[in-house]
């Protein structure tokens, strides 16, 4: 599994460069629901030809979490407008794109039962993400 990090510890960088945007702010992604979503990382699994894009979405957790039905359109949007454009330069597209939202950072593969996580799978077809039963 190959990992690309999009989120990191930014306090020192922010303190050293006041008035400049941080990498975290630059990785914020606008979604239809309007909830704050930040690109966290992507993981390539060559064995299954799957690219996973993971996003931090704090509002799916907490006291009044957004449910799966409310954020499902966001996941489609993230696949179509965030994931696919980042795969465009490859000779071969992955067979499957998995979009995941997590309320807090979670190590890949960790079930973390106390942290809400939502997942959807898509196949890249004709320039769009086609939903796949997961």
Task: Label each residue range with its predicted role.
Residues 13, 43-45, 69, 89:
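Generic marker of residues within folded, mature protein domains
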């Amino acid at each position: 599994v190959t990992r690309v990090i999009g989120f990191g510890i930014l306090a020192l960088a922010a303190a050293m460069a006041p008035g400049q945007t941080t990498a975290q702010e630059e990785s914020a992604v606008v979604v239809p629901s309007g909830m704050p979503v930040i690109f966290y990382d992507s993981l390539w699994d060559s064995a299954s030809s799957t690219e996973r894009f993971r996003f931090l979405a704090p509002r799916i957790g907490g006291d009044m979490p957004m449910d799966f039905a409310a954020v499902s359109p966001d996941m489609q949007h993230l696949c179509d407008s965030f994931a696919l454009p980042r795969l465009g330069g490859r000779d071969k597209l992955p067979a499957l794109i998995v979009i995941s939202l997590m309320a807090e950072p979670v190590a890949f593969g960790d079930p973390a039962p106390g942290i809400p996580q939502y997942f959807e799978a898509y196949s890249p077809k004709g320039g769009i993400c086609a939903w796949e039963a997961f």
